[in-house]
Amino acid sequence: PHLEAIGAGTQDFMGNNTIALPDKKEVMEVNPYYADSGLWSVFSFRFLTGKPFTQADVDAGLPVAVLSESLAKRIFASTDVVGKYFTFIGKEFRVCGIVQDVSNATPDTAGDLWIPLFLYSWVSRTFEGEKLIGNVHIYMLAPTPADKEALRAEVQDVFRKYNLQTSEYENDLMQQPDDFWKSTFRKNSCEAPDWGELLKGLIYILLALLFIPAMNLSGMISSRM
């Protein structure tokens, strides 16, 4: 009752991410985003043509893709390309939709193309038999701000119960789930942020920004005297 939508996604910064048209040798570097169908419900994407891939596509690992407007124009010189094909990670992908470009100012959703999550090889791997996977971000949308604490408690309770079934490893959420703004400060998945140190750092930056104009102003006053 405290969850409106949930989605998962991750970017691949390690692979050789190039695409090509089936009938051409020229390749282009791209920034792929691997996602499940829930991502379309959590975040707002503006579809220019076509539609997003479905959860059935994700579960089956079908080679379908949503392209950004810019990438569609780079590859096909048009955005009216639903149903056309291109080659990526050794597979022939069919274009199912085109979305308006997503700004890099929102890196959690930005990409040149979005493809089904289970096509990412790291997602399908397990760790020491405990079925633990990493490098996938889960995004949850609560109906109201008042539901967030209840949703956070429910997630933590699910992991507590899951840990009762594991024999060797224990999952530690490190105080997650975070509010979205807090998640931008989480740089290491293996430890919780030190909010005290982060706050001190921000205060030092603020004081420095205030001190520099003060120095400039005092210099102007001295020169006039």
Give residue spans per PLM region:
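Short acidic/polar micro-motifs at solvent-exposed secondary-structure junctions
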Residues: 4-38, 52-65, 103, 180-184
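Hydrophobic alpha-helical transmembrane segments of multi-pass inner-membrane transport and secretion
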Residues: 191-225
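Glycine-centered tight turns that cap/initiate beta-strands
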Residues: 2-5, 80
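Short, function-defining helix-loop hinge/capping sites that tune catalysis or transport
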Residues: 44, 58, 76, 221-224
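Short hydrophobic/aromatic segments of transmembrane alpha-helices and their interfaces
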Residues: 23, 55, 130-132, 184-185, ...
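Membrane-helix interface segments
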Residues: 26, 146-147, 197-200
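Mid-to-C-terminal secondary-structure elements
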Residues: 36-52, 63-193
